[in-house]
A protein has these predicted regions:
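Glycine-rich, highly charged phosphate/nucleotide-binding loops
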Residues: 72-90, 309-322
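Redox- and metal-dependent alpha/beta enzyme cores, enriched for Fe-S-associated oxidoreductases
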Residues: 30, 41-42, 47-59, 248-313, ...
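Short, acidic/turn-prone active-site loops that include or flank metal/cofactor-
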Residues: 59-65, 70, 133-134, 271-276, ...
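Acidic/His-rich segments in extracytoplasmic proteins that coordinate ligands and/or metal ions
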Residues: 83-156
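TerminUS-proximal long segments
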Residues: 317-325, 330-332, 336-342, 347-401
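A charged, amphipathic alpha-helical module
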Residues: 1-34, 146, 155-282, 310
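Metallocofactor- and cofactor-centric catalytic cores in central/energy metabolism, strongly enriched
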Residues: 8, 15-29, 37-46, 65-69, ...
Length: 401
């Protein structure tokens, strides 16, 4: 379908996403680095890359049966949480040195509990830590959040592994984190073009490897890919029939983006968990303020998680979806939700109507399984949505004539 010249490292990036314990993770650990697993944006990524630590945002690629995890967690819990437990029981996370969990939702909390109870990692120094996450932004919730990160994350890393978690070390980690964010953001800006030099699938793959690989080892590939994209020539005519923004819960499977684009809809914005919004915004640090507190405030302010129930955050999520769809010239919005996701179940049901009725956006609202890249039913719904967007465009053009 695509005539764009293949990106040099795309196949390698896809290979890195085949397993959580990928080639670069193994290389970093062989060099003595400490691997920290996490699942949620509410664990500040930069903090997990302090000193000789590196973060891996956990996925369970090619998940098949999750029957054993379902036995422990019931079939009314989100499949992402169950897939992680299933992969852990299979031994797929033995490479981790620690698991940094957050009580962002009850299902992920249950998953982290099972990492401990079922002893899915046999390393003597392995530990699972849990952090409580706020529902709204106030001085006291920020104070609590900072304490949680200091006590349950930074102090534990120092106690168990002797990691330097000083203010200077945190700032160094943020500098490296910001370079990754700047590169991904610059690639993202390219998606605003009428005929972009990067597809949504390619961007999804590149963004995912930035979450799942050691920063110092993936950065050279990201730098080279950015330089390559700057010289890449777009197709003379775009092969896509529509442009869409995706909003919603966790998507770590780029095959879902591939499915949507295979239906003719170019994905131009990724406002979902594991996406670039939020997650790939540069963290601006002031020299005269505590770095940890600034990072925690940054995460709280930029979070688009449906966990936040304050009126201003609910409005922020809608305004962000509207802003991104406009900035990236989307013609419609796909609101998606992992099946049994409590927070996004409520958010999707309400916001999908509000974005249509009050903001005027064509909206496709879907709930989906964890791995949905080959769903015939979903493909049919996306194809119908693309056709509806084409019809709207035709009517709009006829109205101007």
């Amino acid at each position: 379908m695509y005539c764009l010249k293949d990106l040099k490292h795309l196949i390698y990036f896809e290979k890195l996403l085949e397993n959580a314990d990928n080639e670069l993770v193994q290389k970093a650990q062989a060099e003595g680095d400490i691997c920290l697993g996490y699942t949620c944006y509410h664990v500040p990524e930069a903090l997990l890359n302090v000193g000789n630590c590196f973060s891996v945002r956990l996925r369970a690629p090619h998940t098949g049966s999750i029957d054993i995890a379902t036995y422990y967690m019931s079939n009314y819990t989100c499949e992402y949480a169950r897939a992680l437990v299933e992969r852990g029981i299979e031994g797929g996370y033995q490479f981790l040195d620690a698991m940094i969990g957050v009580d962002a939702c009850s299902m992920m909390n249950r998953a982290m509990e099972h990492f401990e109870i079922l002893k899915v990692n046999e390393k003597p120094s392995f530990f699972v830590t849990h952090c409580d996450i706020p529902y709204k932004i106030t001085d006291y919730t920020l104070d609590s959040y900072v304490d949680q990160m200091r006590i349950h994350v930074l102090d534990r890393l120092t106690e168990v592994f002797g990691v330097d978690t000083s203010d200077a070390a945190i700032r160094a980690a943020v500098a490296e984190h910001n370079e990754v964010c700047s590169i991904i953001s610059e690639m993202g800006e390219m998606r605003k073009a009428d005929n972009p030099v990067i597809t949504g699938y390619e961007f999804h793959v590149i963004n995912l490897v930035s979450y799942t690989c050691p920063k110092r080892l993936i950065l050279p590939y990201l730098r080279e890919t950015l330089a390559e994209l700057k010289k890449r020539k777009p197709d003379k005519v775009s092969p896509f029939r529509a442009r869409v923004a995706i909003v919603g819960s966790e998507i770590d499977d780029p095959d879902l983006t591939k499915l949507i684009e295979g239906c003719g809809a170019l994905v131009v914005s990724d406002r979902f968990c594991f996406g670039s919004t939020p997650g790939r915004e540069v963290i601006e640090l002031k020299d005269d303020e505590d770095a940890l507190r600034q990072i925690c405030l940054h995460v709280m302010e930029h979070s688009e998680c449906a966990r936040y129930i304050a009126d201003e955050k609910v409005l922020q999520r809608r305004e962000t979806a509207d802003r991104l769809a406009k900035e990236y010239n989307a013609e419609g919005i796909i609101y998606e939700q992992m099946k049994y996701c409590d927070y996004w179940g409520f958010e999707r049901a309400l916001a999908s109507h509000i974005m249509h009725d009050e903001y005027g956006w064509p909206v496709l609202s879907i709930d989906r399984l964890y791995n949905n890249g080959n769903s015939g039913q979903l493909r049919t719904r996306v194809q119908a949505f693309v056709e509806s967007l084409e019809i709207k465009r035709i009517h709009k053009e006829e109205g101007k004539a």
